[in-house]
Amino acid sequence: MSSAPPTNELALTPPPPDRPELPDGVEPTPVVPRWKPVGVVLAFALGLAVTLAGTLLIGGIAVALGADAKSLPSGVNVLLTLVQDLAFVGAALFIASTVARPEPWQFGLRGTRIGPFVGWLLVAFFAFNVFGWIYGALVNVPAQKELPDELGADTGAAALVAAAFLVTVVAPLAEEFFFRGYVFGALRSWKGMWVGAVLTGLLFGAIHLGSTPDVLYIPLLAVFGFVLCLLYVKTRSLYPCIVLHSVNNSVAFAGTRDGWDWEIAVLLAGSLGTIALIALLMRRFGGPGPTILATA
């Protein structure tokens, strides 16, 4: 059986033409980097490793200065929690940088129209609260007071403000950046929106195992993480997710404080105002990002 001799036709074939030029004033549609699922594993591992190293370092210094290793001061706990949040944000940025230079818009830090922002945020808020009401009616979920008190919320005004800032501002920003901005982005490009949202929700619930007073909270947190993924998809912006996360944490934080009334409104206004200021600063120094995101 004979075959035709090989030719160099392929080698002589000219390369495909460049993409056609766009009209003046028209920007090309940016493409979100296709982060890999292995990056999620690496980001988790790196975040946990940095958190552990920071805990050993800061905790060791505190113990060397006379603190009780079994009951660290609230200020140390605040610092350790901050280190953990920053560790996971840094891990996401580092792993993402191995694929492409990280830009804020790639993680969803971009504006969106006010209509979808408010509309879908309200839908997500009511959907999660309906689920929470049904879940609470079926399962006896214990009250949660441990975390704010561990952060020193009951030891004075300054400690209360620090704990509130950490829970209602830092945590929503860091967790949404890591889970919705990076983890969901990677898993969505791997297995699609629904599988990505489910997996991200499960991971979001699992990461809170050490900070919740009862395992019965984990399904609630997993569903909350899932809802936040869908909110991100509908608005194509991380900011509605951050706002909803902050509102949820603010209400939960206020629920741990006995006798709070008008303080709840102050907490909500303060946390959302701070987040809005941070968003404006990011937009100013990081750029507004593209108008339309390509679907990953």
Model-derived segments and spans:
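Low-complexity, intrinsically disordered extramembrane tails and loops of integral membrane proteins
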Residues: 1-38, 291-296
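C-terminal membrane module of polytopic membrane proteins
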Residues: 3, 9, 243-296
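Alpha-helical transmembrane segments in multi-pass membrane proteins
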Residues: 44-99, 267-269
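Functionally important transmembrane alpha-helices
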Residues: 54-56, 198, 213-271
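Juxtamembrane helix-loop-helix connectors linking adjacent transmembrane helices
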Residues: 61-78, 101-171, 189, 287-294
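Membrane-interface helix/loop boundary segments of multi-pass membrane proteins
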Residues: 174-199, 230-237
